[in-house]
Amino acid sequence: GAKKDLAQIAMAYGHVYVAQIAMGANPAQTIKAMKEAESYDGPSLIIAYAPCQAHGIKGGLANHQAEQKRAIDCGYFNLLRYDPRLEEQGKNPLQLDSNMQNN
């Protein structure tokens, strides 16, 4: 069957803090997402892109950070944060942290 988008499913509930991170691609976004998730008074879900040896990365796992960056840059995996508290303030709760401008 088709792959399900766990982040999208969790965001549909409306009361779950959701983040997609890739520490090797954007450490600052990772830290920000973890702090926000920890401070959220409700369920939080952090989905991390973490390549493994089975992915067949050229040069092995020594290149995992570059692989994470490539996955983000090409749009295979998006960095995002969904914070329901922002909606309470009249703001968009979904923040896309991936930079697709260079693609």
Which functions belong to the PLM regions below?
Residues 1-40:
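Conserved thiamine diphosphate
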Residues 30-103:
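Glycine/aspartate-rich loop-and-adjacent alpha/beta segment that forms the canonical ThDP
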